[in-house]
């Protein structure tokens, strides 16, 4: 990487609370989830902050539980899900004009549902919208569990507005959490039958055949697992591939590695990004535990490989050279843009990176059409940069 010039920072700002995750909405605003620990009480709280693309704070929505992850629905990007340290997820609605040329000060964000999935001392580590089923949501937690829920809607059409109406009609109960009383909706989740032995940090829906009914999970037990989405039964696991916890997974999608439908990308605390060929998993085969992969490739990124975000479709079209690109948040080693190319001697190649301004754990990042936004935790750093 010595020959690669570090990318230039466009804008930088210090957030009020430590930023843990972020997403960019329609190339117009940056949504940031924050996580703060009160050491005197042990209570964790956070906020959903909204920034312009030049990092001016538009508004901040305080949450009684810290935010560990946030995602936008691929079916209606005005629907946000946030994962919290208090066993709950929250659904939010962005209200703005339907046109992409809206001004950032013309939008409004408000919570539409507070769903209690687990006990209040369980942290929800990640949340994921299904790429195939608009109502399906996947979560993981620090008790080692992964589960799905079905999002309620009163309309045939899946919209944030219809979801808000559906949850507004449900009874809320008083719930004692962190010394306060909050209004929540208790939701029964469909848990996968085989949990991880330690924290389940991440998960991913399969997208392409034959994995369209498979969910992959990664845990602090160094184990990568596959589960049947329909029956919730265990399919396959391996704890001999990674030398530390598995914290990020990326499956092939129509716009990402679509020529490798049986391959997944993983990231671990052991600093390595890996490509795993899982062709040994047939459509009706349950291989069991520690069955080796057909093939694996690895690259040391010099920091824990915490999060993957694939390049936007329009950027991939302009970048088109037979390779796929990921933004990788590398914890204590900043963020990197990594390409994957079958036509190269080295499958993984670092194309761009940013370390300056991220003197702490880089946990969150996303792309817009023109820039990348990343955040790091203990130094409260939010930055934008170009590649």
Swiss-Prot record:
Q: Catalyses which reaction?
A: diphthine methyl ester-[translation elongation factor 2] + H2O = diphthine-[translation elongation factor 2] + methanol + H(+)
Its GO CC terms? cytoplasm; cytosol; endosome
What EC numbers are recorded for this enzyme?
A: 3.1.1.97
Where does it localize?
Answer: Cytoplasm; Endosome
Gene name linked to the record: RRT2
Q: What is its main location?
A: cytoplasm
What does the UniProt record say this protein does? Catalyzes the demethylation of diphthine methyl ester to form diphthine, an intermediate in diphthamide biosynthesis, a post-translational modification of histidine which occurs in translation elongation factor 2 (EFT1 and EFT2). Also plays a role in the regulation of the retromer complex and is required for the recycling from endosomes of plasma membrane proteins like CAN1 and MUP1. Identified in a screen for mutants with decreased levels of rDNA transcription.
Q: Per the UniProt entry, what species is this protein from, by scientific name? A: Saccharomyces cerevisiae (strain ATCC 204508 / S288c)
Q: What is this protein called?
A: Diphthine methyltransferase
């Amino acid at each position: 990487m010595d020959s690669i010039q570090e990318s230039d920072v466009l804008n930088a700002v210090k957030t009020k609370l430590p930023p843990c995750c972020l997403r960019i909405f329609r190339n117009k605003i940056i949504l940031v989830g924050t996580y703060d620990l009160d050491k005197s009480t042990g209570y964790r709280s956070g906020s959903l902050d909204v920034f312009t693309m030049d990092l001016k704070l538009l508004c901040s929505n305080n949450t009684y539980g810290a935010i560990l992850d946030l995602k936008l629905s691929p079916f209606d990007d005005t629907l946000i899900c946030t994962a919290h340290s208090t066993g709950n997820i929250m659904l939010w609605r962005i209200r703005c004009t339907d046109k992409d040329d809206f001004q950032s000060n013309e939008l409004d964000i408000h919570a539409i549902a507070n769903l209690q999935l687990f006990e209040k001392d369980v942290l929800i580590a990640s949340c994921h919208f299904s790429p195939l089923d608009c109502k399906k949501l996947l979560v993981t937690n620090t008790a080692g569990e992964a589960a799905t829920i079905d999002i309620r809607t009163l309309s045939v059409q899946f919209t944030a507005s219809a979801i808000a109406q559906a949850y507004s009609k449900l009874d809320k109960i008083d719930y004692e959490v962190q010394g306060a009383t909050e209004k929540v909706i208790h939701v029964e989740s469909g848990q996968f039958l085989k949990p991880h032995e330690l924290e389940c940090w991440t998960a991913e829906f399969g997208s392409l055949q034959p994995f369209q009914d498979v969910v992959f999970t990664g845990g602090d037990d160094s184990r990568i697992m596959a589960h049947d989405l329909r029956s919730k039964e265990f399919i396959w696991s391996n704890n001999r591939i990674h030398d530390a916890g598995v914290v990020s997974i990326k499956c092939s999608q129509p716009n990402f590695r679509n020529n490798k439908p049986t391959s997944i990308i993983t990231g671990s605390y052991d600093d390595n990004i890996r490509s795993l060929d899982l062709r040994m998993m047939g459509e009706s085969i349950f291989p069991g535990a520690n069955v080796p992969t057909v093939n694996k490739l690895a690259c040391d990124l010099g920091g824990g490989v915490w999060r993957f975000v694939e390049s936007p479709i329009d950027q991939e079209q302009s970048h088109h050279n037979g390779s796929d690109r990921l933004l990788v948040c590398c914890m204590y080693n900043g963020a990197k843009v990594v390409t994957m190319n079958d036509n190269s001697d080295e499958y993984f190649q670092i194309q761009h990176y940013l370390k300056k301004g991220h003197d702490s754990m880089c946990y969150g990042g996303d792309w817009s059409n023109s820039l990348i936004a990343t955040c790091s935790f203990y130094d409260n750093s939010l930055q934008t940069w170009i590649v």
